[in-house]
From Swiss-Prot:
The keyword Nucleotide-binding applies. It comes from the Bacteria. InterPro entries: Phosphoglycerate_kinase (IPR001576), Phosphoglycerate_kinase_CS (IPR015911), Phosphoglycerate_kinase_N (IPR015824), Phosphoglycerate_kinase_sf (IPR036043). Substrate binds at D21, F22, N23, R37, H60, L61, G62, R63, R121, R154. This is Phosphoglycerate kinase. The gene is pgk. It is an enzyme of class 2 (transferase). It is found in: Cytoplasm. Keywords: ATP-binding, Cytoplasm, Glycolysis, Kinase, Nucleotide-binding, Transferase.
């Protein structure tokens, strides 16, 4: 099924409901500290404005638990203020996302004007994909557009449910870009195709690794998950984080990679500490084996060099998961080193959301990447080969 996109529709004079992802971080004063997700939705919003649509935006923010101060702490007002600045036009903020007051605001909305509904998750029915709630949202719209890739793996009322009750539906430009880039990187990659996979647990990345073993030429492993693989090979790892119940699974993954002639590279040296703290002494262990009393907290310099060489020779590089505890400076060189190597590469470079996207942002090299995914869980599920409800709902 082909993805129908917003530019294929006539939007003039229509009520266009765009599901965006404005789940942005706020400071204690309630100001937006990182507007990347708002900026990512601008091409779709601007297209709808220029097409003279009545633009209705909807998003969630945080995880409201029905507490009295939720409405104050998790209001979308800061997002409305920032969006208004970015668009250089007024953005009306509704005090709810359903109800008579919202219906009146939609009725009064002029062509080319923008209304932002209040936090969808103030209603528990949103995450339950409640049919009555989905129908109520759908009653506000002639056209439904999904431009929230970050929640595309969730079958919620606004991300999938309401699409059944709206005549016209489409993907926004951000969802289109995500599906095209991730699909191309994994479906028909230019070779050599190198994957960099990190993070704490093998169990979190089983499906990702299985899918990549079927497609990649080489997989470079970092992060705490590497110690489970090393221990599975009989290498001492000191007091590093290991998933003891996943050692057999790690062996099977290594065997599968070998059988398919995929180079699965593990660290050959490590940056270690006695504990995972910024104040711990930084010890470079120039060997695969980690001594007792130390834990691996980052890949070592030799390993980083090996991974850099693989990145430099690749035509496609996909990265998901940090190489170490990069949030703390002593253990950040491996992660930032990989990020910089990817930025310097002429290859198609795709960063698969979550912590790796945060690392690229911190390194200040987002623009050097061909694609940085806005979806953490969504990009992982896409890579695992799963169907995303929020994408399927946009198909013709």
């Amino acid at each position: 099924m082909a993805l129908r996109t917003i530019d294929a529709l006539d939007l003039a004079g229509k009520r266009v409901f765009i599901r965006v992802d404005f789940n942005v971080p706020l400071d204690p004063q309630g100001r937006v500290t990182d507007d990347a997700r708002i900026r990512a939705a601008l091409p779709t919003i601007r297209h709808a404005i220029q097409a003279k649509a009545k633009v209705i935006l909807a998003s969630h923010l945080g995880r409201p638990k029905g507490k009295p101060d939720d409405r104050q702490k998790l209001t979308l007002e800061p997002a409305a203020v920032r969006l208004s600045e970015l668009l250089s036009q007024d953005v009306i903020l509704a005090d709810d996302c359903v109800g008579d007051g919202v219906k009146k605001l939609v009725r009064d909305l002029k062509d080319g004007h923008v209304l932002l509904l209040e936090n969808l998750r103030f209603h528990p029915e949103e995450e339950k994909n409640d049919e009555a709630f989905a129908r109520e949202l759908a009653s506000l719209a002639d056209v439904w557009v999904n431009d929230a890739f970050g929640t595309a793996h969730r079958a919620h009322a606004s991300t999938a449910g309401m699409a059944r009750f709206v005549k016209e539906k489409a993907a926004g430009f951000l969802v289109q870009k995500e599906v095209e880039y991730l699909g191309k990187a994994l479906g028909s990659p230019a070779r050599p195709f190198v994957a960099i996979v990190g993070g704490a647990k093998v169990s979190d990345k089983i499906k990702v690794l299985e899918n990549l073993i079927a497609k990649a030429d080489a997989i470079c492993v970092g992060g705490a998950m590497a110690y489970t693989f090393l221990k599975a090979q009989g290498v001492p790892v000191g007091k590093s984080l290991v998933e003891e119940d996943k050692l057999e699974l790690a062996r099977q993954i290594l065997e599968r990679a070998e059988a398919r002639k995929v180079d699965l590279l593990l660290p050959v040296d490590h940056v270690c500490g006695a504990e995972p703290k910024e104040t711990a002494e930084r010890v470079v262990v120039n060997d695969r084996a980690i001594p007792d009393g130390l834990m691996g907290l980052d890949i070592g310099p030799k390993t980083l060099d090996r991974y850099r060489q693989r990145i430099a020779a690749a035509k496609t590089v996909f990265w998901n998961g940090p190489m170490g505890l990069f949030e703390q400076k002593p253990w950040s060189e491996g992660t930032f080193g990989v990020a910089k190597a990817m930025a310097a590469s002429p290859a198609v470079t795709v960063v698969g959301g979550g912590d790796s996207a945060a690392a690229v942002e911190q390194a200040g090299i987002v623009d050097a990447m061909k694609h940085v995914s806005t979806g953490g869980g969504a990009s992982l599920e896409f890579i695992e080969g799963r169907e995303l409800p929020g994408v399927k709902a946009c198909e013709e």
